[in-house]
Amino acid sequence: MPVFLMALAALGWERPGLAQEPIQSQEAPQVETRDQHSVPAAAAESERTRDLPLWELGLGLGAVAFRDYRGSDTTHAYPVPVPYFIYRGQYLQADRSGLKTKLFNQDRVEFNFSLNATTPVRDNAARQGMPELRSTVEIGPALQIHVWRSESQRVKLDVRLPVRAAFAVGSPGYIGWFSNPNINVDIADPAGLRGWHLGMLTGPLFAASRYDAYYYSVAPQYATPDRPAYQATGGYAGSQVLAAVSKRYPKFWTGAYVRYDDLDGASFENSPLVKSHSYWSAGIGFAWIISRSDRLVKVPDTQSPSVTESQ
C-alpha cells in the first residue's frame, strides 16, 4: 500500500514489500447499524458520537525489518517516514487504512483502494548473478464487507477482497496481479487498555504467473549447479497472520505490527530462490500531528468516555 510506508505497515500492511493490506483504523467515521430490538441503553451506547476535525495532518519516523522478498532468508531493517493523514468526509474518507468510499450507499459494504510498495533487492546471495529486483508499486480496488459489529461498536469483523496490479519501476513495467483476501478483526480498548486499538488479520495470498515469475523464476542463462532453472506458474502464494496495535494521543500517534508468513504449499515453494518457508517481520512508528481542520464533524465514538474526553 504506498507512499505511506511505515504508517501503513504499522497498521497491518504487508509485504512482498514495505506494507500492504490494512487493519481498519478507528479514525474514519463508520455508519452505525442497530438492531431494532436492542435495549435503550445499548442504543444510547451505539449512538454516542464525538466531534473531531474534518482533516488532520502529521509526520513522523519509524523502522521496519523484513525479508528481501517473501521466501528470502535475508532480513534488512529500514528507517521510514511516517506520514499521517486523516479525512472524515461524508462520502469519502482517508485514514491509515487507505482511501475509501461507500459502495452503492450500503452500510455494510465499502469500496477501498488497495496499495503497496516494495524496496529494490540488489545484493541477495540467492540471486547472485541475476538481475536485481526493482522497486514495485501495486494499486487496485478492494471490497470491504462489514460482517459483524458489537453493540458498543468496539469489536468489528470485516472481510476484505483486494486485487492489485503490480508495476516494477522502470523495466519490465507491469508484472501481473496480486491478491490477499483476508478476515480482519479490530478491537478498541483491548484488555481494558483505554485508547489502544488491536487489529488482527489472516488470509491466503494469490498471484499471477507473471508476478511469481518476477520473484521466483530462474532463467536457463542464470542457472548454476546450486540454482537450477525454474519457471514459476502462479496461483496460491502462501498465507499470513498479522497483529498490530496503535494509539492516538492528543498530539501524536504511535503504532507497531508483527507479521508471520507461511509459504508451505505455495505454487513457487520449490523455487531455488525460496530459502525460508516461514518467518516473522515487524515494524514500529510514531507521528506528530502538526495541523488540523477548524471544522468539526461527528464521528461514532468507539472509545471509553475518559479517552474521548482527553482528546
Residue ranges and their predicted role:
Residues 44-55, 70-71, 90-109, 148-157, ...:
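Short loop/turn motifs that connect adjacent beta-strands in outer-membrane beta-barrel proteins
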Residues 55, 75-81, 107, 133-139, ...:
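Residues that define the transmembrane beta-barrel architecture of outer-membrane proteins
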Residues 46, 67-69, 99, 126-129, ...:
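Extracellular loop and loop/strand-boundary signature of outer-membrane beta-barrel proteins
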Residues 61-65, 81-87, 98-103, 139-147, ...:
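Residues on the lipid-exposed face of transmembrane beta-strands in outer-membrane beta-barrel proteins
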Residues 1-52, 292-311:
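Cleavable N-terminal export/targeting peptides
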Residues 172-253, 261-267, 273:
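Outer-membrane beta-barrel transmembrane domain signature
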Residues 241-311:
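Predominantly the C-terminal beta-signal and adjacent terminal strand-loop region
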Residues 64-70, 118-124, 146-150, 164-170, ...:
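Sequence/structural signature of outer-membrane beta-barrel proteins
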